[in-house]
Amino acid sequence: MTKTLTNKLAKKDHAAVVTYIMGGDGGLDNLEEQLLFLEKSGVSAIEIGIPFSDPVADGPIIQLAGLRALKEQVSLEAILNKLARSKVQIPLIIMSYINPIFHLGIPKFVELVQKTPVKGLIIPDLPYEHQTLITPELQGTDIALIPLVSLTSPKERLEEIAKQAEGFIYAVTVNGTTGVRSEFDAHIDNHLAYLKSISPVPVLAGFGVSSIEHVEKFAHVCDGVIIGSKVVQMLHEEKTAELGAFLQKAAEVRIEN
């Protein structure tokens, strides 16, 4: 069964733009408003981060957003209960470290997710070899477990991951944490082009994407981008008009590969 998320992000004329927000940053009452705003801005899907006290993959902007959410007593269960009432039409993606999911209980987590518009799941600290901790519970659902692949992964590993990939492949474009960057590794284009050539699902570039130039660069070699730290920071600074204009422009970038 092809997942809803794959169909939504599959190659079209324009780059797929997925945005990241921290669930509960600014309070849970703002979550639906943020989601509807991003949907109206033309993004393809929205990633919702779950606040966690030890966020190993997050850069400083997202770490601060997580701390703000934790101060509001935001939890994974509270976010999912809020999302169950969401009117958003585009797919949502939960990005959570494994601990909050274990704490809630995997069966209960999957049960709650299925009552929401969430169609994808990213667990950055769950190694590919340990995915069977959660994949049995996802069998027969429309929830894709999205793999992250790094710049340093050998070709054999990339091929193994691509063969099993659902939703899309999250291609990490830097070695390190998330955050706004001005430049990328010189080998990134070849890495993404190779991934694209072997992947049965869309390939999206993430970590450090923060400008229209970045979106245009990656539109030459993959299917789209994930924009995180820039979105989190601009929402926090209440620069919604500027952010909306940026995202609309990003969503108009044409795929050139």
Swiss-Prot record:
Pathway info: Amino-acid biosynthesis; L-tryptophan biosynthesis; L-tryptophan from chorismate: step 5/5
UniProt-listed HAMAP family: Trp_synth_alpha (MF_00131)
One GO cellular component term: cytosol
Sequence similarity: Belongs to the TrpA family.
Function: The alpha subunit is responsible for the aldol cleavage of indoleglycerol phosphate to indole and glyceraldehyde 3-phosphate.
Catalytic activity: (1S,2R)-1-C-(indol-3-yl)glycerol 3-phosphate + L-serine = D-glyceraldehyde 3-phosphate + L-tryptophan + H2O
Active site: 47 (proton acceptor), 58 (proton acceptor)
Alphabetical list of Pfam families matching this protein: Trp_syntA
EC number: 4.2.1.20
Keywords: Amino-acid biosynthesis, Aromatic amino acid biosynthesis, Lyase, Tryptophan biosynthesis
Catalytic EC class: lyase
Protein name as it appears in the record: Tryptophan synthase alpha chain
Highest rank taxon of the organism: Bacteria
Species name: Listeria monocytogenes serotype 4a (strain HCC23)
Key word Plastid present: no
Subunit structure: Tetramer of two alpha and two beta chains.
NCBIfam families in the cross-refs: trpA (TIGR00262)
Classification of source organism: Bacteria, Bacillati, Bacillota, Bacilli, Bacillales
CDD domains: Tryptophan_synthase_alpha
GO molecular function: tryptophan synthase activity
